[in-house]
Amino acid sequence: MWFKNLKIYRLSAPWALNGDQLEECLARFAYQGGNNLEMQSLGWISPRENGLLAHTLNGQILLTLRAEKKLLPTTVVNQVAKARAQEIEEQQGYKPGRKQMKEIKERVTDELLPKAFSIYRDTRVWIDTVNHWLVIDAAASAKADEVIGLLVKTIDPLPLDNLYVEQSPAAAMTGWLAADEAPANFSIDQDTELRASGESRAAIRYVKHSIDVDDVRRHIQSGKQCTRLAMTWADRVSFVLTESLDVKRVAPLDVLKENPDAATQNDDEKFDSDMTLMTGEVAKLLAELVDSLGGEKRV
């Protein structure tokens, strides 16, 4: 249930859609399985496999985007097209020209696509209409952009802004390391990366290793800045903050994993319980993280 990698955005206006209106918007761009004539297709699927495209609970909305990609190697298309071209050459007495070869490859692609294997990738989206967050569970910017691209088509207009803070994460993390002091309610963990800003981009990394403060200060004095820092919030959630304000490797600690009601809950109740826990904890984490970076910057 817990999102692992957070791409964070702001809702710039109050959420205006009710449940039925949101379902109607999502249905227009629902994933259509079995479309055999496209290399890639995108669409919304049910987060709970219950038919509803949005799972809504106490102002928290969960969506899932499915991306299907056909596996059709260019070498396979070229091999079949080459064989077809030889047949045509025998029939017409001369080799197909460039335009004709292009048409042959297009026909071959159309013939092979229905037989090609597909790979599927699901990306989850959390919309917090209470605290005005929109969070995508994606490690790569390209995947987040894919989601945003379909979201703006699905919900028009979509009240969405990038998140900006007063102090850059790199400057803040560098300051915390130099002072050997984390902001209130946070602690610094054992993974970090410091990187030079010049052409060399030389980097030093601590991986599951206690940070030597004097060593880190020497690197900072030589011009390096912190670009990744492992932290824990409130002894409840661990994560890695990056220079681009991404929050990666999010993990609830043991205190949050203990659910005394789990044994008596059915699947739906457990899902809702996990969703309530995650959205509540991460919303508070994000608010305090933004505060530790000087607050939100209005642009």
From Swiss-Prot:
GO biological process, any: DNA recombination
Give yes or no: UniProt keyword Cytoplasm.
yes
Places the protein is found: Cytoplasm, Nucleoid
Instruction: Give GO terms: molecular function aspect only.
Output: double-stranded DNA binding
Disulphide bridges, residue numbers: none
Provide the alphabetized UniProt keywords: Cytoplasm, DNA recombination
Q: What is its main location?
A: cytoplasm
State a GO cellular component annotated for this protein: bacterial nucleoid
What InterPro entries is this protein classified in? RdgC
Cytoplasm found in the keyword field: yes
Report the PANTHER family cross-referenced here: RECOMBINATION-ASSOCIATED PROTEIN RDGC
Q: Which family does it belong to?
A: Belongs to the RdgC family.
Q: Which NCBIfam families match?
A: PRK00321.1-4 (NF001463), PRK00321.1-5 (NF001464)
Q: What does this protein do?
A: May be involved in recombination.
Would you tell me the protein name for this molecule? Recombination-associated protein RdgC
Record organism: Bordetella pertussis (strain Tohama I / ATCC BAA-589 / NCTC 13251)
